Amino acid sequence: EISCSLVGSEMCIRDRLEAYFPGSEHVYMSVIPDKAAFMETPEGYTPAGAQETADYLAQRLPVEIIDIAPLLALEDYYRTDPHWRQERLSAVAQTISEAMDAPVPDMTEETLCALAGEFHGSYWGKTAEPLTADVLSYITSPLLDSCTVYDYETDSTGGVYDFTAAEKSPYDLFLGGPKALLRIENPAANNDRTLIVFRDSFGSSLVPLLAGSYRTVYVVDIRYMATDALARVTEFPEGANVLLLYSVAVLQNSITLK
């Protein structure tokens, strides 16, 4: 059964693609499964599936689907939060990069770090059984350390990890949390490729793992930005790769998309 909300998301995405990337052959989409898809759910509740959602959109939008659901399992998500864990996403990042014919960067110099203290996600204190706290880990490397992130809203530049934002909300460590439009520059890139990612909050932790394959990555969250506003702010280069990276939860709740 197709929800009205999914139809709304389809129309919203189609409007964006027609406005900015008419006729592009480089538009890709990955649908992020809901954590509930990997859990026992209460009787009578069936979470919307990533496969059906992707199939529906693939039939109606000019996109190539990159299926990442088979790469994910319950342990790839936080215990206390609906989001996925960045340190578990290397295979997802590699699969997406390869599907877009992007060079997969050398990750041999990666280091796994962790924020100090426990991570209490949005489920904390709201479940019948007490949950074990999470640790919020993040991946660093000389390549990621050299990347700069420009925030169009605040006209400021920082890194891919925002430790100040993380003090208030730990998951906002990744790209500073909810942001309408960011531009990541990778001075270590061995090419001039550009990637444009339309994403929700799940993209915050995955996009840094894709950035190494490109000179420039634009990160767009249309939940905070109307269509016409994007054209006033920046022009996207022709021939760029476009990735629609959305969770089932957002696609099935199109009211959040503008």
Label each residue range with its predicted role:
Residues E10-I13, T53, V92, L206:
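Stable alpha-helical elements in mature extracytoplasmic
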Residues F21-G44, Y246:
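Active-site segments of SGNH/GDSL-like serine hydrolases
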Residues R88-T194, R199-G212, T216-V217, R223-R232, ...:
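Extracellular/periplasmic envelope-modification machinery, especially enzymes
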Residues A36-A37, P42-Y45, E52, A58-E129:
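Catalytic His-Asp segment of secreted/periplasmic serine-dependent ester chemistry enzymes
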Residues I13-F21, L206-L210:
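Histidine-anchored nucleotide/phosphate-binding helix
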Residues S24, L61, Y214, E238-A240:
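Short, well-ordered alpha-helix to beta-strand connector turns
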Residues E1-G8, C12-I13:
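Single conserved hydrophobic/aromatic residue that forms the stacking wall/gate
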Residues S9-E10, P47-A50, P82, Q86-L89, ...:
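Solvent-exposed, acidic/flexible segments
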